[in-house]
From Swiss-Prot:
PROSITE patterns with a match to the protein in the record: HISTONE_LIKE (PS00045)
GO annotation (BP), single: regulation of translation
The name this protein goes by in its record: Integration host factor subunit beta
Recorded name of the encoding gene: ihfB
PANTHER family, per the entry: DNA-BINDING PROTEIN HU (PTHR33175), INTEGRATION HOST FACTOR SUBUNIT BETA (PTHR33175:SF5)
Keywords per UniProt: DNA recombination, DNA-binding, Transcription, Transcription regulation, Translation regulation
Keyword DNA-binding annotated: yes
NCBIfam families to which the protein is assigned, alphabetical: hip, PRK00199.1
Subunit architecture: Heterodimer of an alpha and a beta chain.
Claim: DNA-binding is one of the keywords in the record: yes
Family: Belongs to the bacterial histone-like protein family.
InterPro entries for this protein: Hist_DNA-bd, Histone-like_DNA-bd_CS, IHF-like_DNA-bd_dom_sf, IHF_beta
Length: 101
């Protein structure tokens, strides 16, 4: 599912809202999550999961084409950990008994 499909589904379930208003709300939520992560904050949506930032240290990499060693700078990457309710629901729907915890 892409963002436009999400907006459309939410608008269909909420006929009292205009689709452009739903799109503005979805964009505002995503912007707030990104802003919080950029500040170094953790964003927890109870039952859904938590977004955080992991910091990867600089390391030596390798160019796969030439085999030459190249330095890879440190970087921050987004990380998402699923919430318990989401894991349980996904496992119930797929029949998987391993909760991944």
């Amino acid at each position: 599912m892409i963002k436009s499909e999400l907006v459309q589904r939410i608008a269909e379930h909420n006929p009292h809202l205009y689709q452009r208003d739903v799109e503005n709300i979805v964009n505002a939520i995503l912007d707030e999550i990104v802003d919080a992560l950029a500040r170094g904050d953790r964003v927890e949506l109870r039952g859904f999961g938590a977004f955080s930032v992991k910091h990867r240290p600089a390391r030596a990499g390798r160019n796969p084409r030439t085999g030459a060693h190249v330095p890879v700078d440190q970087k921050s990457v987004p990380f998402f950990k699923t919430g318990k309710e989401m894991r349980e629901r996904l496992n119930r729907e797929t029949g998987d008994t391993d909760t991944g915890a």
